[in-house]
UniProtKB/Swiss-Prot annotation:
Swiss-Prot/TrEMBL keywords: Cell membrane, Disease variant, Disulfide bond, Glycoprotein, Membrane, Phosphoprotein, Receptor, SCID, Secreted, Signal, Transmembrane, Transmembrane helix, Ubl conjugation
Protein name: Interleukin-7 receptor subunit alpha
Free-text comment on this protein's domains from its UniProt entry: The WSXWS motif appears to be necessary for proper protein folding and thereby efficient intracellular transport and cell-surface receptor binding.
Coiled coil: none
Self-association and partners: The IL7 receptor is a heterodimer of IL7R and IL2RG. The TSLP receptor is a heterodimer of CRLF2 and IL7R. Interacts with CD53.
Domain Fibronectin type-III as annotated: residue spans: 131-231
UniProt keyword Manganese, yes or no: no
Extracellular side: 21-239
Post-translational modification (record): N-glycosylated IL-7Ralpha binds IL7 300-fold more tightly than the unglycosylated form. Ubiquitinated by MARCHF8; leading to lysosomal degradation.
Position of sequence motif Box 1 motif: 272-280
CC per GO annotation: clathrin-coated endocytic vesicle membrane; cytosol; external side of plasma membrane; extracellular region; nucleoplasm; plasma membrane
Residues with attached carbohydrate: 49, 65, 151, 182, 232-233
Residue ranges of the TM segments: 240-264
Gene responsible for this protein: IL7R
Length: 459
């Protein structure tokens, strides 16, 4: 019996070893499964098919053996407690209307009934939008720019409507030099001057949720290719017409500045900023009222109290006085000899050389009459003929000169007679014969100057 029991024990042990090597032990599978890394990631898509939402999960390590693994979600569900994922090659997904979208759900990786790893995830924070589509680029020749437009399915959805888009473009020969532009609309304008001329460009776009919903970038849209037009003139060259206009404008401005600097003080400043006199005198001149009844008239009635002599009258008197200086001393000397000599020599009448006529007074005897000289106008005029009585002329010689001097003097004139008269007799200093006449001339000139000065003062 002992030998039989030992034999059965050895056979049983051999069976266990053989069965373990052939892979039929479930406990060994569990131990090997616990040694692998089952980390995973998930994303949700809302309203992918009408009102249904989808949840997709996948292992981060692509080498994990997923033959006996399953995914299960529990919590934040409507009408059910848990839901199992469907397996599609290397991914697990579920599409249903029973997501509550409020709160967190528990997602686990299971082998049979045993959970290997679990995560708590809020489906509103792992939203991945759908990729944009209908990407196109249109060139506007007038504006020299490119208009980029695209479309997205989230514009008609209720939940994820606000998206941020990322537009990326590059020149075809530059594989890794992408230029990114973020925008919230579905339209973008690219300026031609920011792109290389005659070059091929590739452009694509993707989206990400914004505001309440959070998540990941969507897949890139299909790429679109466009070519930029050629430019006749390179960026380094300049239009000759524009260059000529620029040069002429520069020189014109420089010339104007130089002329303004040169002519500022003499021409421009007096016109723009005229120099004003003293403000007090200017205001006094502007505000002072003129006096009334100013004596600015040249009417003779306005100068009745002034003695006015014309220049011609003064010149005539000067000529007469000069004539008397030459003629009267000779006549006076002869008459003096006749008076002292008695009857030694017969008296002679005045010759034609000493005859005094109105023409000798300046050829204008009417000037004295105009001045109011009545005696001069009534005085007898000496003729060139001899006197009727030469004897009486010898005795009355002084009276003749006295009448002549009286005819020169006037009652209204300010000029005194050139000789001093005492009781009708003309007296002269025998020592200096010309002195009385010179003295009379000096006084006459001073009186004429005073008269003209008073005339200008009154004026």
């Amino acid at each position: 019996m002992t030998i039989l029991g030992t034999t059965f024990g050895m056979v049983f042990s051999l069976l266990q070893v053989v069965s373990g090597e052939s892979g039929y032990a479930q406990n060994g599978d569990l131990e090997d499964a616990e040694l692998d890394d089952y980390s995973f990631s998930c994303y949700s898509q809302l309203e992918v098919n009408g009102s249904q939402h989808s949840l997709t999960c996948a292992f981060e390590d692509p080498d994990v053996n997923i033959t006996n693994l399953e995914f299960e979600i529990c919590g934040a569900l409507v009408e059910v407690k848990c839901l199992n994922f469907r397996k599609l090659q290397e991914i697990y997904f579920i599409e249903t209307k029973k997501f509550l979208l409020i709160g967190k759900s528990n997602i686990c990786v299971k082998v049979g009934e045993k959970s290997l790893t679990c995560k708590k995830i809020d489906l509103t924070t792992i939203v991945k939008p759908e990729a944009p589509f209908d990407l196109s680029v249109v060139y506007r020749e007038g504006a020299n720019d490119f208009v980029v437009t695209f479309n997205t399915s989230h514009l008609q959805k209720k939940y994820v409507k606000v998206l941020m888009h990322d537009v990326a473009y590059r020149q075809e020969k530059d594989e890794n030099k992408w230029t990114h532009v973020n925008l919230s609309s579905t339209k973008l304008t690219l300026l031609q001057r920011k792109l290389q001329p005659a070059a091929m460009y590739e452009i694509k776009v993707r989206s990400i949720p914004d505001h309440y919903f959070k998540g990941f970038w969507s897949e890139w849209s299909p790429s679109y290719y466009f070519r930029t037009p050629e430019i006749n003139n390179s960026s380094g060259e300049m239009d000759p017409i524009l260059l000529t206009i620029s040069i002429l404008s520069f020189f014109s401005v420089a010339l104007l500045v130089i002329l303004a600097c040169v002519l500022w003080k003499k021409r421009i400043k007096p016109i723009v900023w005229p120099s004003l006199p003293d403000h007090k005198k200017t205001l006094e001149h502007l505000c002072k009222k003129p006096r009334k009844n100013l004596n600015v008239s040249f009417n003779p009635e306005s100068f009745l109290d002034c003695q006015i002599h014309r220049v011609d009258d003064i010149q005539a008197r000067d000529e007469v006085e000069g004539f008397l200086q030459d003629t009267f001393p000779q006549q006076l000397e002869e008459s003096e000899k006749q008076r002292l000599g008695g009857d030694v020599q017969s008296p002679n009448c005045p010759s034609e050389d000493v005859v005094i006529t109105p023409e000798s007074f300046g050829r204008d005897s009417s000037l004295t009459c105009l001045a109011g000289n009545v005696s001069a106008c009534d005085a007898p005029i000496l003729s060139s003929s001899r006197s009727l009585d030469c004897r009486e002329s010898g005795k009355n010689g002084p009276h003749v000169y006295q009448d002549l001097l009286l005819s020169l003097g006037t009652t209204n004139s300010t000029l005194p007679p050139p000789f001093s008269l005492q009781s009708g007799i003309l007296t002269l200093n025998p020592v200096a014969q010309g002195q009385p006449i010179l003295t009379s001339l000096g006084s006459n000139q001073e009186e004429a100057y005073v008269t003209m000065s008073s005339f200008y003062q009154n004026q």
